[in-house]
Amino acid sequence: MSNFDFLKDEFIDLYELCLEAEKNCYIKPRTSAFYSRLALEFCVGLVYKFEKIQTSYNEMSLNDLINKKEFKDLFQDESQIAGLNLIRKFGNDAAHMLKNIISNADRNLSLNKDIALNCLKGIFDFTVWIAYCYGST
């Protein structure tokens, strides 16, 4: 049983990404943060699709998509966007270790279960919103 079972029927691909993030949260926090970011990308793509938000090829980074005015206007509170950006940043850290090693930054090496859990909570909240807004049930 998963906290994301509510996604199974209508958003199976999203469910599978979230399930990986959930399964790995305590045993492989880096993997969990990475899958939370992938789920975030999927969710943002769904919002753009369902809301028919236009974007150009030059605006295709996740950062650009999250911070685009038409996307941000869908949310009541700026803290919701800040939460999505944290998932994006920690997911980036999980995936891109080389830059941080070369620059001697320690933040990439400190991805722990607390960070993974915060990412997971954030993606859970976003997927509940996705299911509520765009699901049929």
Each predicted region: which residue ranges?
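A ubiquitous short alpha-helical element
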Residues: M1-L7, K72-Q80, N108
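Charged alpha-helical initiation segments
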Residues: M1-R30
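Amphipathic, well-ordered alpha-helical segments in soluble domains
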Residues: D13, L17, Y35-L38, F42, ...
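Short, charged/polar, low-complexity loop and linker segments
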Residues: E16-E20, S61-D73, H96-N104
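Hydrophobic alpha-helical packing segments in soluble, helical-rich domains
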Residues: P29-Q54
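Charge-enriched, short contiguous segments at helix-coil
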Residues: A33, E78-S136
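Conserved NTP-handling cores and scaffolds of large molecular machines
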Residues: C43, V47-E51, K69, D73, ...
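Short, charged amphipathic alpha-helical segments flanked by flexible coils
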Residues: Y48-K89
